[in-house]
């Protein structure tokens, strides 16, 4: 127990829908908290929630984690952020925010730190749901984010690599031109998409092959415009 009230219990459920992205559904005291905001929310991808900078990166310095989104870019369609921090032997979730200005009215949650860390660790290690192209997508994302030359040459930053169970061999790269902060800073931006097919070989070798293809490829030939800020009236060239 704490001076501010009862501690909650956290469970992180990985949901693989028939179509769409894999979701992490945070369940607090048996209640799916993403079912409470307006209809249409989907849990965020495990790479975002459980990866670097996600729920496991907890100390006394608060940081935001995106727990849910709808689709497209978050300023357009909305997303759900929570601020995560450590207070003594507790982990606190509060400061809920929706960049699109919609509802983000959720209460503060407090978890016992040891139990919280154990649950996040368990969920991060659970890969039983993953299919081969999903593994390739994760490895490819790591390579591209570490390749500053590719990002500079393409004048883009990688937002995500999508793959879905209904098209298990297809990868879709989501890129933002000129960079990921453009939308937040109010600068012109474009969302670009690149479709790739993953082979059935070793995932690490497939990721290397696709990264090499992108490194030697031309953005104008490989990418399509998927979305844009109001600043752009015509297709990006």
Question: Which residues make up each language-model segment?
Answer:
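N-terminal "first-domain core" detector
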Residues: 1-48
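Preference for solvent-exposed, low-hydrophobicity sequence contexts
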Residues: 154-237
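Charged, amphipathic alpha-helical segments
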Residues: 1-13, 49-52, 139-162
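Amphipathic, interaction-prone secondary-structure segments
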Residues: 19-20, 43, 51-83, 148-188
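Short amphipathic beta-strand/extended segments with alternating polar/hydrophobic composition
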Residues: 31-41, 101-112, 182-198
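Short hydrophobic/aromatic-rich beta-strand segments that constitute the beta-sheet cores
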Residues: 91-95
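Surface-exposed beta-loop interaction hotspot
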Residues: 96-151
């Amino acid at each position: 127990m704490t001076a501010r009230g009862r501690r909650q219990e956290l469970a992180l459920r990985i949901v693989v829908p028939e179509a769409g992205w894999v979701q992490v559904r945070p369940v607090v005291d048996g209640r799916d908290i993403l079912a409470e905001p307006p209809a249409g929310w989907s849990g965020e991808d495990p790479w975002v929630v459980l990866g670097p900078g996600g729920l496991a990166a907890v100390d006394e310095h608060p940081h935001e984690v995106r727990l849910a989104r709808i689709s497209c870019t978050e300023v357009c369609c909305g997303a759900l952020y929570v601020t995560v921090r450590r207070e003594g032997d507790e982990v606190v979730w509060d400061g809920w925010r929706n960049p699109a200005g919609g509802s983000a009215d959720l209460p503060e949650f407090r978890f016992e730190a040891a139990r919280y860390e154990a649950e996040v660790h368990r969920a991060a290690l659970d890969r039983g749901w993953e299919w081969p192209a999903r593994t390739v997508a994760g490895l490819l994302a790591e390579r591209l984010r570490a390749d500053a030359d590719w990002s500079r040459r393409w004048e883009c930053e990688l937002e995500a690599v999508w793959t879905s169970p209904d098209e298990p061999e297809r990868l879709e790269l989501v890129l933002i031109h000129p960079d990921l902060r453009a939308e937040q800073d109010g600068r012109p931006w474009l969302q670009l998409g690149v479709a790739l097919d993953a082979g059935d070989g070793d995932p690490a070798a497939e990721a290397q092959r696709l990264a090499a293809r992108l490194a030697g490829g031309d953005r104008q030939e490989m990418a399509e415009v998927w979305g844009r800020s109001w600043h752009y009236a015509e297709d990006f060239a």
